[in-house]
């Protein structure tokens, strides 16, 4: 029994020496004592290849490469102890979830923390750490007693409570495992216990290579190997000079030196002979003097400079994608020009979550075979999502999001349907569920679902059309596709008495859906498209899910469990599932994490993402215990994993390992921005490299090739997939700025695409975008007639929409596009309710021959309650009755109608104007409808403007009859003559024109009428600020002022006094007008003369004719208006359709100049002056 160390700096040949010794021994004695070659898990494959890679050794039974866990498996198979069921990470998380749920009431700190994402991953890691460091539940309990007895501060009590929770959960976990199960950490403890009984290990020659430190558990294994084996050889990366001086925690080799001393101490304790250490001083790894210099002087202070040609290259990239593309281009160059194999190249990185997806995509585009040494989670696979969402449907009472997450996995679809058709139908079905607010009991009820198009509150027609009946049948058919398998599982889960029966319900759910056949179809499709990685995913995921169910049954099969806990435990297990890595092929670029990689025999290393906070790593205090808490436990004798401070001290060694892997070339790169465009800083490590290598190449990488030389641009010509975007970039430059002499070879590349049989069709769409202009071509007369008909019939809002943006008008009224209907209460719905409520009250007053002025406060409250109760069942598929939240909203709306009724009562008492009618239709046909506003357009097309007027008021005096328009609005609004001029606010003046033009035939007395004005009434329930001692009357007066109607009124003092009979001088509280003492109007009054009203009405006619002419002539320009801070695009539903983009030459706003009312009026006069 002896111990031997082989030490040396990185690249000194430690592994090579050991491998050569083993190979020579196998060559001399193929059938001797066992040779164990122990390496970290991630080194096993490459070490196995290296061991049998020589000409003399093509295979071996005597020598085997193991990790500690694989050695444990081997020994336990020999001596026994492997019969207990293994539970993987997913099983551990599921068991912990169950333990926490059952212990929840007794936990001090983790009761609420258990609901946070990642809690069970952290808890599992903490327990694994306890085991690796030989900390038992009783050790943790003793620690809690000690902490509890001496806790005085809040921080000490928190730690004591945390340790108490941990010992409870750890003890429960161990009790659940004992005699039945083994987790990954238990194998190593069993290995320690069983090594003395192993004949396979007894007398073995043991090599331990590639480790820098050992956990206490691993150190015990080393102890037993020294006792049982003939000789143990351990390699450590240490400079011999370090051993000759006192150890310092700032030394580069501090960690490995401590490991060296610990192992020697173990050997002394066991009286193991310690052979003379073999120091290796040469640097056989490095074929480059620069890399040899970097290794030899890495830790030197000040930095030792290398003045020769550096085989180190630094790349600074504009962004992460440009960085990865730069790496891909250089890899292709090395393979094409310097005869590298892909296996000679490795890419090292730390923040893989930011890079892996981009690297998979780009390396595939560049045809670079690659292997990412990182397991991917299964959580996004359709099968995992199907199970998780189906369980959420049942436990969460059939919520919309869970249902359609399950639907979108497409595993609920019948096996024999065409997926494309089913997707379209399910999209329609989802629209229905959104529009009708389908959830909860409606899914499980046997009552068929009804389909009716919602039109308006006035639509009381109960007849169903053929198209509605057809849609209703389709919806009920699709409902059954979705709900039937889930309801079957729901019933089984409710009947289930044990976890085993619940797992069986999940299994039967999958079997009845033909999931194995569907996954097989997905696998075949992936193979046919050449995506072999995803093809194997579909095989793995089924096996892992079945294994998870088996584990669940094995661990908890006979226990009873609530449905919610079963769902939580199952979800925890599913989240832990990971895809196993496919072993790398013989010729692939290896992409690995800096902290976990153990590379060898690579000629070129690319270290990417070298940004501040990443390399070296910024301190991160994460996990169950903080650094301070770990220090407290350490002081009390419980050794755990290194703290953040210790990890930071080890970071220099990690970086040293990182830059000493390659034999010939080292590339270091960093992006200056992430995928979202956020600025990133280069690491201080790059500055260090620049100081060591003054001649280092520092290249800036960008995806914009315009500023590069011709030779540099040629490197961007890679695969056809990648190069196409650069061709486009260059041709766009040529198009904008002309030929600059640097583009000639890009024309050759362009010619390849347009002449290649394979790429001609593939590239045509991309290349055609070179001449793309986001401009809507004018419709032909024939198309325009097909869309709009021979007679245009539209509302004033439609005409205003055309003037806001002709393309939006085309999308809405030509193509009939609309947003999908969602079961929610929007502003238009509330506006509709307000209008209907006030009309119902007014109609009741008319039937009773009363006016608003006759109402008492109590009657206002009663009527507002009555009408809201009448309307609520009719609005938006009974949305106000659908939930407690909407019921509360209904009460708030009733209060607004109540307040509005009180104000209308006050207005009626102060006004000579009385309502003639509400919701007055014109051009709508039927009884009581006024005629439309009609126009004959120059091209012969007839146009009718139709609509519905909120309220028409009338007043009479000795000067005649006056009519005014009141428009109810749920937000504050006034009449802006600038917007009238631009055709954006035509509604009120149109209404006034309609009623005054038809007054003689419409009103009972048959008199002509003059315009009195147009006013907006803001329906709301305002909050007012008053002094603390304000009386009720003063408060009501302030509220009344908040309802002052804005708009434009006739500049006649008598008419204004008819609107507010309390007005003598000063400003009116009812309308936007005021009188001076001399009887003239104040400057702030919004008034117009009768002649000006006539001009405005003529201008409205003029504007409608122009709009009609443009519509019928096919004008659909993408030309939204912009006026100040208002723009047509702000609330437009069609932005995704028109793709308006200000950066494009053709896409610019029509900027409308703001004007004073007097200026606008003058321009309006000029427009209609000739009419």
Swiss-Prot record:
UvrD-like helicase ATP-binding domain sequence ranges: 1-343
InterPro entries: ADDB_N, DNA_helicase_suAddB, DNA_helicase_UvrD-like_C, P-loop_NTPase, PDDEXK-like_dom_sf, PDDEXK_AddAB-type
EC code: 3.1.-.-
Keywords assigned: 4Fe-4S, ATP-binding, DNA damage, DNA repair, DNA-binding, Exonuclease, Helicase, Hydrolase, Iron, Iron-sulfur, Metal-binding, Nuclease, Nucleotide-binding
Binding site residues for [4Fe-4S] cluster: 805, 1129, 1132, 1138
Domain of life (superkingdom): Bacteria
NCBIfam families to which the protein is assigned, alphabetical: addB_Gpos
Described purpose of this protein according to its UniProt entry: The heterodimer acts as both an ATP-dependent DNA helicase and an ATP-dependent, dual-direction single-stranded exonuclease. Recognizes the chi site generating a DNA molecule suitable for the initiation of homologous recombination. The AddB subunit has 5' -> 3' nuclease activity but not helicase activity.
Full protein name: ATP-dependent helicase/deoxyribonuclease subunit B
């Amino acid at each position: 029994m002896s111990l031997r160390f082989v030490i040396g700096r990185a690249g000194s040949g430690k592994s090579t020496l050991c491998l050569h010794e083993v190979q020579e021994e196998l060559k001399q004695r193929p059938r001797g004592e066992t040779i164990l070659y122990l390496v970290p898990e991630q080194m096993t494959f490459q070490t196995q290849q290296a061991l049998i890679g020589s000409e003399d050794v093509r295979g071996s039974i005597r020598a085997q490469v193991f990790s500690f866990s694989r050695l444990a498996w081997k020994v336990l198979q020999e001596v026994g102890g492997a019969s207990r069921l293994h539970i993987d990470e997913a099983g551990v998380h599921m068991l912990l979830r169950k333990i926490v749920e059952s212990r929840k009431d007794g936990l001090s700190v983790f009761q609420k923390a258990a609901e946070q994402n990642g809690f069970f991953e952290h808890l599992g890691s903490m327990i694994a750490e306890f085991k690796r460091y030989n900390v038992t539940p009783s050790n943790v309990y003793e620690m809690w007693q000690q902490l509890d007895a001496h806790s005085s501060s809040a921080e000490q009590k928190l730690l004591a409570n945390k340790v108490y929770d941990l010992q409870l959960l750890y003890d429960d976990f161990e009790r659940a495992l004992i005699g039945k199960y083994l987790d990954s950490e238990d194998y190593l403890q069993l290995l320690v216990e069983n090594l003395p009984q192993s004949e396979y290990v007894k007398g073995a020659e043991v090599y331990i290579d590639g480790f820098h430190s050992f956990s206490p558990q691993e150190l015990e294994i080393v102890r037993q190997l020294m006792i049982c084996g003939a000789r143990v050889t351990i390699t450590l990366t240490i400079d011999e000079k370090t051993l000759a001086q006192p150890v310092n925690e700032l030394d580069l080799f501090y960690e490995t030196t401590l490991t060296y001393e610990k192992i020697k101490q173990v050997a002394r304790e066991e009286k193991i002979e310690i052979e003379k250490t073999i120091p290796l001083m040469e640097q056989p790894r490095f074929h480059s003097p620069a890399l040899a210099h970097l290794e030899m002087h890495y830790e030197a202070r000040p930095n030792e400079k290398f003045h020769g040609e550096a085989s180190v290259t630094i790349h600074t990239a504009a962004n992460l994608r440009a960085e990865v593309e730069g790496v891909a281009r250089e890899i292709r160059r090395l393979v094409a020009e310097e005869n590298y194999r892909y296996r000679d190249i490795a890419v090292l990185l730390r923040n893989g979550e930011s890079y892996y997806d981009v690297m998979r995509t780009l390396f595939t585009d560049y045809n670079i075979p690659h292997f990412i040494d990182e397991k991917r989670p299964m959580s996004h696979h359709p099968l995992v999502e199907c199970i998780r969402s189906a369980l959420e449907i049942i436990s969460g009472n059939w919520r919309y999001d869970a249902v359609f997450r399950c639907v979108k996995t497409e595993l609920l679809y019948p096996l024999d349907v065409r997926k494309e058709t089913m997707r379209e139908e399910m999209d329609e079905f989802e629209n229905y569920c959104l529009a009708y607010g389908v959830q909860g009991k409606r899914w499980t009820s046997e009552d068929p679902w009804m389909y009716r198009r919602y039109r308006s509150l006035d639509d009381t027609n109960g007849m169903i059309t053929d198209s509605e009946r057809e849609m209703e049948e389709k919806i009920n058919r699709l409902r059954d596709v979705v709900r039937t398998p889930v309801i079957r599982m729901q019933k089984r889960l409710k009947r289930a008495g044990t976890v085993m029966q619940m797992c069986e319900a999940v299994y039967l759910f999958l079997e009845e859906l033909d999931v194995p056949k569907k996954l097989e179809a997905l696998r075949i499709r992936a193979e046919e498209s050449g995506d072999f990685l995803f093809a194997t995913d579909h095989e793995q995921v089924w096996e892992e899910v079945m294994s998870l169910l088996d584990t669940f049954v094995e661990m908890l099969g006979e226990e009873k469990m609530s449905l919610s806990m079963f769902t939580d435990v199952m979800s925890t297990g599913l989240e832990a599932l990971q895809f196993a890595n496919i072993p790398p092929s013989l010729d692939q670029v290896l992409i690995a994490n800096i902290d976990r990689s153990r590379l060898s025999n690579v000629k070129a290393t690319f270290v990417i993402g070298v940004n501040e906070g990443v390399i070296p790593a910024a301190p991160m205090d994460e996990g169950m215990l903080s650094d301070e808490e770990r220090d407290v436990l350490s002081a009390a004798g419980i050794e755990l994993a290194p703290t953040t401070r210790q990890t930071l001290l080890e970071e220099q060694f990690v970086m040293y390992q990182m830059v000493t892997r390659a034999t010939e070339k080292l590339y270091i790169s960093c992006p200056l921005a992430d995928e979202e465009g956020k600025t990133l800083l280069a690491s201080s490590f790059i500055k260090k490299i620049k100081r060591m290598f003054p001649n280092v190449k520092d290249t800036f990488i960008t995806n914009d090739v315009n500023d590069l030389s011709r030779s540099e641009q040629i490197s961007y010509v890679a695969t056809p997939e990648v190069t196409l975007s650069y061709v486009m970039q260059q041709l766009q430059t040529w198009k904008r700025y002309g030929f600059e002499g640097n583009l000639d070879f890009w024309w050759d590349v362009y010619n390849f695409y347009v002449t290649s049989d394979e790429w001609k069709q593939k590239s045509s769409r991309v290349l055609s975008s070179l001449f793309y202009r986001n401009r809507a071509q004018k419709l032909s007369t024939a198309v325009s007639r097909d869309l709009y008909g021979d007679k245009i019939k539209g509302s004033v809002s439609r005409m205003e929409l055309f003037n806001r943006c002709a393309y939006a008008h085309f999308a809405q009224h030509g193509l009939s596009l609309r947003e999908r209907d969602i079961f929610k209460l929007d502003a238009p719905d509330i506006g509709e309710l307000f209008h209907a409520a006030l009309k119902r009250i007014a109609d009741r007053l008319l039937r009773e021959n009363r006016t608003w002025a006759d109402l008492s406060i109590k009657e206002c409250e009663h009527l507002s309650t009555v009408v809201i109760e009448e309307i609520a069942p009719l609005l938006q598929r009974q949305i106000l009755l659908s939930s407690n939240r909407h019921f509360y909203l209904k009460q708030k709306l009733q209060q607004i109608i109540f307040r509005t009724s009180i104000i209308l009562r006050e207005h009626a008492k102060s006004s000579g104007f009385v309502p003639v009618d509400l919701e007055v239709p014109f051009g709508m046909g039927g009884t009581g409808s006024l005629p439309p506003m009609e126009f004959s357009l120059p091209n012969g097309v007839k146009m009718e403007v139709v609509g519905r007027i909120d309220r028409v008021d009338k007043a009479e005096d000795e000067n005649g009859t006056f009519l005014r328009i009141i428009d109810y609005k749920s937000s504050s609004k006034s009449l802006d003559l600038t917007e009238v001029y631009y055709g954006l606010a035509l509604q009120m003046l149109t209404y006034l024109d309609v009623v005054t033009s038809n007054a003689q035939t419409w009103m009972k007395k048959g008199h002509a009428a003059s315009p009195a004005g147009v006013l907006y009434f803001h329906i709301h329930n305002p909050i007012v600020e008053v002094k603390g001692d304000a009386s009720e009357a003063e408060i009501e007066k302030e509220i009344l002022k908040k309802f002052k109607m804005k708009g434009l009124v006739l500049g006649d003092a008598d008419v204004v006094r008819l609107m507010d009979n309390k007005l003598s001088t000063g400003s009116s509280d009812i309308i936007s007008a005021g009188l001076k003492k001399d009887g003239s109007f104040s400057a702030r009054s919004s008034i117009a003369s009768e002649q000006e009203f006539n001009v405005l009405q003529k201008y409205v006619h003029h504007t409608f004719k122009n709009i009609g002419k443009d519509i019928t002539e096919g004008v659909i320009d993408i030309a939204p208006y912009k006026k100040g801070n208002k723009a047509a695009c702000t609330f437009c539903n069609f932005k995704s359709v028109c793709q308006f983009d200000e950066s494009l030459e053709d896409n610019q706003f029509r900027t409308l100049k703001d004007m004073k009312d007097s200026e606008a009026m003058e321009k309006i006069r000029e427009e209609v002056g000739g009419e």
